[in-house]
Amino acid sequence: MLFGAANIDLGALGIPDVTGYREHLYEVTAGRIVFPSVNGPIPAAWPTTPVGVTGFYTIYPDPDQLLTGQLDEALRAFIGSAPSQGGVLTAYAEADGDAANGGQFASLGLTKAKLLRVHAHLQALCRGSLVKYGAVVCGTGLDQVLFCPPGLDFYALDWYDNWNPPLIRGLNAWRENLERHVQESPVLAIAETNSNVPSQRPSWFATVYGWLAGYSAENGGRALGYWSYWRTDAGIGSLSGPWLPGDAATIAALTRIAAHCKDDV
């Protein structure tokens, strides 16, 4: 199982056995991130990561151009340049946010129906390559899960303590809704997770990982990876808050998880 983080290199911070790195490839205008947006870049080549670290990227391309094939050449070049260890790709992560109003990209013309076609198109472009394609949601209910089509390489969840979720019950609901309504025996991943309360991070990380590892053990290793998320520019009280280099308990918890992920293949 891959192990890593979004926005920071855990390996450079002293965590051993890091095998994954996640990044959102947002539209940037005048040095500022534009979000939500459906005009994000498609890199000319797969970004370089440290040896042994698999890159996991979220893209936000123009959906109409994508569905008419105008972006196929650029996407094939991007996907085809993934390194030998492969890569992980998704588009419009957390599109299920504000599901009751059609999702958080609906005001930009990316409806749920169109999103399902986008996911299918990108999955087809990744088929036969070294890149695994999937969908990332931020809700566990049926309305959120139905933002995912069947047939993807993986299905991932962003899951945060400050949303005050029913931790295990929520994860079980996500799995059950996927299995009953979208995809039998899905490959699952935790694409982002953290607690905004530093003292709760060790138990939060361990519990979320334990749930995913249990699913993997019960289903022949059908878990792709586990990524924490860090906002280096945010204070305590945001989704994550910054990495705290003196937080020995969290560092120890992540080190243990990394070692377990290395063995869970």
Can you annotate each of these PLM segments?
Residues 1-41:
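Boundary/entry segment of secreted carbohydrate-active catalytic domains
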Residues 6-7, 116-144, 185-199, 224-232:
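Aromatic-lined carbohydrate-recognition surfaces of secreted/lumenal glycan-active proteins
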Residues 37-138, 230, 242-245:
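Substrate-binding cleft of extracellular glycoside hydrolase catalytic domains
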